[in-house]
Amino acid sequence: MRELTSMQAACWIGRTAHAALGKVSAHLYAEFDGHAIDLERLRAALQQVSLLHPMLRLRIDQDGLQGIAPMEQAPRLEVDDLRGLAEPEVAQRLLRKREAWTHQQLDLRHGCAARFSVSQLEGERSRLHVDTDMIAIDPSSLRVLMEDLARCYEAPDAPVATPPSFFAWWDAVRADPALKATQERDRQWWRARLDSIAPAPTLPLLDVQPAQAHSQRLTTWLDANQHIALRQLARERKVTLSTLMLGLFASALGAQTGDRQFRLNVPSFWRAPLIDGVERIVGEFANVLIVDVDLDAAPDIAALCNQLAKTTAACMAHSAYPGVNLMRDLSRHHGTPQLAPVVFTAALDMPGKELFSPRVKNAFGPLGWLISQGPQVALDAQIACADGGILINWDIRLDALPEAWVTQLFERFVDLASEVARQPATLDQALPRAPEKRPLNPLQQAYLLGRTTQMPLGGVAMQEFREYRGMMDSAVLRSRLDAMVRRHPSLRTRIDADRRVQYVSDEVRLNLDEVDLGHLPLAEALGVIDARREDYAHALSPLDRSPWNVTVFHLAHGERVVFVRLDALILDGRSIATLLVELFEGQLEETPQVDTGAPKADQTEQRTADAAYWNTKLAAVDGAPRLPWSVPLDQAGVARYERQSLVVPRETFKKFCMVGARQRLFKNTTLMAVILEVLSHWVSEGGLCVAVPVAPPSDAAFANRSSFLAINWNRAAGSFAERSAGLQVDVLEGLQHLAYSGVDLARQLFERHGPGPVLPVVITNGFSWPVAPSDSAMRLQGGLTQTPQVAMDIRFWADADGALQLDIDYAREVLAPALVSDFLGTLGRAIGQIAGAGEFALAPAALIDTDHYRLNSPVEAACRDGYLARIADHLFTPGNHKTALISGERRLSYSELGDGVARIIAALRARGIGQGQVVAICLPRSPEHTMLTLACALTGVIWVPIDVAAPAERRHYLLENCHPDLVVLGQAQTLEQPSTTCAALLATPAAAPGHLADLSLNEAPGYYLYTSGTTGKPKCVVLNNRATANVIGSTLAEWRVTERDVFLSVTPLHHDMSVFDVFGSLAAGATLVLPAPGEDKDALRWNQLVAEHQVTLWCSVPAILEMLLACRGEHGLQSLRLIAQGGDYIKPAVIAGLRELLPQARLISLGGPTETTIWSIWHEIGADDRKLIPYGRPLPGNRYFVLDAQGRHCPVGVVGRIHTAGANLALGYLLDGALQQSDFITVDDEHGQAVRAFRTGDCGRYRVDGTLLFDSRVNGYVKVRGVRVSLPDIEMVLNQHPALRHVLVVDYGEPRLGEVCLGALYVCDPQAAEPSMAELRDYAREHLPHSHVPTRLLGVAALPLSQNGKPDRRRARELLSAPATASVRDKVLAIYLQVLGHSNEAGTDSAVDFISLGLRPPHLKAVAAQLQAQFGVSLSPGQLLRCRNAQEVERLLG
């Protein structure tokens, strides 16, 4: 087995490569039309030739090495007998066979390098089909093969000398030291010229190439006289005939493409004479010469031929280094794949002159068809001697090149060759001079880049599409268009994308297409047009011509529909409008002067000054507008655009402009200000920076000289009138600073605020653009503009009647049509409002459609449930033996529970504790905690649950702040406040209390709950029974709770959701199960309790529910009929698991901060809630508003801060015993009425159906495992550590999936000793609640900062989210496996769920001990219980 040659390797790879023009084999297919072929003689000849030439049996193995297959695999003659078939059938079969053989790939893996077949035809006619793979048999070898085949056929018994093998020659080549030295010399020669090698010809390659190749040929024959004339001319000019034809081809190709310099692929088949008889070898000897063509260096074709003769000779002299290797070097040099897709193959000066000898013709008939394919070859122009003349045979890839274009090139070449044969002086005629080429300006280059798909919202051309309909004579339209192309250089401007230059062609080319639909009924014809509209509007105009197109659809009765598409590479908006008026109305503006392209004055100083101006001006910009994008802009793909429009009547628009004029505002400023003000309602936060196209006045030829300004609209700055005046100043100032272009601005903004488009909103002023008269015969029907990286282009102009036309072209991938429609409708109302009132002011309440608030309800709709009276009735009705509480082995009936409550009521009264006084409950979960809570609630005593697990310092603050009259403890201890134990309160028997006033609807303070704050201390929320009654009553009714239900209390008792567990269950007369002491965090035990007591209702934060599910084991939880989650993100994956586990259970999402009493919004999770669980709709008597930073109501889909109002509002906060109202504010509702509301730390957005969706949190609040946490609080505490200088705390993970952790980056004080990780973690646990302790602590040299000097939280999240090292995870996993008694021989993954390995809570003590021994970090079993796998344990280890 031997290595492949460079050419063989390239062809082998090209068979499967997915690069351009790949996926074909390099093979040559020929047909010979003969007479009376003797099949047996041919079979014998083929057998003999297979012995002579082993390369017919070439085999390539899986390692890419070549060898020879045994003779058993030699090609066999195939026969197709088509005699007796009808002539049309014969023709069809032959055509199908030609098509199949043209595109086949011979099976070289099994030694099939050639294929032979005979089609037998009537009248003893036959056709010999021969297909050879060029990896084994190059074109020069095909001549040898066919000659030997004919010789063996002609004289079967004549001896034929065996030629040497190709492998012998190839071994000699590889071993020859002189050839190796020559190859290295030539490699260095080519390497020194890599920079100067010309580019590939500019071919109009099809944008979308089919999956399968499609090759076809164009062919003609120059007769013997022409052959003689050309050969005589070549001798006279001292060049070979091949060089003469190469010069003619290069001239024709340059004229067709417009290229002045390009490279051609010129094959050579020279065989190094290293062994005797090399000329008789059949094998692969091909090389490619990369020949440069420079038309600018040749005044005429004769000079071009001389140039090419010298260039080709130089290439030949250095051809020891393979051309395939050279192209590979060129690709590496440029960093992109380099091709030589145009091949020129000449066989005019070979021995014997003719392509095939008379012997071959006599044996098999004349050559009737010849075609080849080759990887990365789009056009192979072959020239050969045949039948005394010259055969011109071009093989073309029609899956890559337009047939019309290549046919035109073919005819151009044939005409030129014929003309030169007839008139030799043609060689001396001057070649057309190259048009002046000018570099593309930055905007044009940006538009070219936008045509690619490598950027978000790319893959589009910046172009304008318009559609007209009416009556117009086609001849008139064609005549006008012809005149316009002649008159306006822009319509002849070509763009060279490879060289980034533009030039004006002398060719008057009408990019006019006509489609005749006159034979169709009108409705059907319009349907055809409708089907073509979108693709036409989005198509990228090819750059092998000026990028514009006019397509005329001819309808019945002389009516026309005209599509027009013009690219901004050559024209700006005003130029387009002007040209279309000229086309359809015949109205000409004064003839613009030709732009000579003279160099402009040096603007270096002006540019520097303008850059400084814009740097200051844009300092306040905080990134792209935060509109309700359907997908993040930096993740958007290729854009497709749609248009929505609005027409404002002339009178309304006139009044509107007059109002603006009284403010000394231009018409465009007035309208732009209203657009920006209205659009700002859809911005969730930050500013609104938009691009405004501008074009300096010019009397030069139509072109695109536009740029754009960046205008920042700050809705918080001053009044609307003041903002509008500032807008006008900004635009006028911007026009004075255009030396710093719009592209410069975009680049500057991208560097500050990328990735993704930074100016996705454009406002285009078309007031100065010409328009057609209202009675035009061709009426504008619509249009579409698209711009790379632009999501919304708001365009305005006035029609001939003075009506305002507003068009919004938007990328539908990132903007919902309903949103655009809402904005357009609001914009129309705003214009009407100003015009009608005559005042330049906007009333947002009258503008924004607030129908999405329709599920809000007034306070009067709140439920007035006497829940406390019902609880008292259940407790104190004699003989009520229904089970009320279960805790471990204890089962308390309602009567027994009532007895305890009665004792505590009596004991409190004995201590003088009554209505309005405060009792702090410092007890673990237990029946006693429940008794004390009920005793206080029933008598009007304000009860305050205190987290007994909180650090001592925090507990001290909680008690000190609420000023308790009594603190009830589990064990006696000394406190600053009066205190007692619960046992003491229960010690004395007492009768059931007498009449208790029903305080269910009392609006006085009923209880306090602590929640996270932003001041470094928890906030004490003051709640009342009236709000609680609404939640209890509404929920019991909605969930249809009865005395048969069983609740399980697992939510911490200082958390608001626990209030429903206690009061909801007991008000319904149901049973409440309490985990026994030590079982609060034992999820395995919870599962047992659910099964043991047939729990029917589960209500908790998502993290607790996930613990239950993770430890489910053999328990099916089948008794649960309703599962409610709230207080944190609900994972869709968990919901999907619940649907599968409990398909009949109701699944409920609950929400609302503690300040709105337990929960104030809910949503029953349905089958459609898969990717995102909605926040829901408010409870009765509540209203949820979404407001922006200015307190304005946000439209549908816009993220704003959530404000709640209504029956569930808390009374305020308790600070040092006094009621405070921070965050309880007054806002205007949708009707403009002032209402008290709570400003939450949450952001959300409404759906059209009135459902609220949660979006994010503000002011440093996050939710972690259901607990609201203030990040600044944690930073404040950690910053007090004496060894730390800076701390930055962030949440990381995926909040929308509920995967949220706290992480802290810290910088140590260089003057202090660096603390250990264990020390920092212990400090955090000592000073922070458990829920606030960071999962991961990471030391850094400096905190990451954004470009504006603020903490870079995004980068912090990246650092904290970095994958843990596998070694740590492996050690953690090994510890768990050891404790569980497993080995890791099977390679258990570190992401495996511990529960699936059999982990149970009793194992965790041993795990914790080993982790401390291994890592020096003390983790409690409770902490480890929440870790599902080794990766999560690794995070705890820091």
UniProtKB/Swiss-Prot annotation:
A Pfam short name: Condensation
Keyword Repeat (UniProt): yes
Gene3D superfamilies attached to this UniProt entry: 3.30.300.30, Chloramphenicol acetyltransferase-like domain (3.30.559.10), N-terminal domain of ligase-like (3.40.50.12780), Nonribosomal peptide synthetase, condensation domain (3.30.559.30)
Annotated metabolic or biological route of this protein: Siderophore biosynthesis; pseudomonine biosynthesis
Reaction catalyzed: holo-[peptidyl-carrier protein] + L-threonine + ATP = L-threonyl-[peptidyl-carrier protein] + AMP + diphosphate; L-threonine + ATP = L-threonyl-5'-AMP + diphosphate; L-threonyl-5'-AMP + holo-[peptidyl-carrier protein] = L-threonyl-[peptidyl-carrier protein] + AMP; salicyl-[ACP] + L-threonyl-[peptidyl-carrier protein] = salicylmethyloxazolinyl-[peptidyl-carrier protein] + holo-[ACP] + H2O + H(+)
Keyword DNA damage assigned: no
One Gene Ontology CC term in the entry: cytoplasm
GO biological process, one term: secondary metabolite biosynthetic process
Region (Condensation 1 (Cy1)) residue spans: 3-427
Stretch list, region Adenylation: 881-1350
InterPro entries: AA_adenyl_dom (IPR010071), AMP-bd_C (IPR025110), AMP-bd_C_sf (IPR045851), AMP-binding_CS (IPR020845), AMP-dep_synth/lig_dom (IPR000873), ANL_N_sf (IPR042099), CAT-like_dom_sf (IPR023213), Condensatn (IPR001242)
Region Condensation 2 (Cy2), annotated ranges: 460-695
Sorted UniProt keywords: Hydrolase, Ligase, Multifunctional enzyme, Repeat, Transferase
Family label: Belongs to the ATP-dependent AMP-binding enzyme family.
Matches recorded under PANTHER family: NONRIBOSOMAL PEPTIDE SYNTHETASE, PYOCHELIN SYNTHASE PCHF
Name assigned to this protein: Pseudomonine synthase PmsD
Species for this entry: Pseudomonas entomophila (strain L48)
Gene giving rise to this polypeptide: pmsD
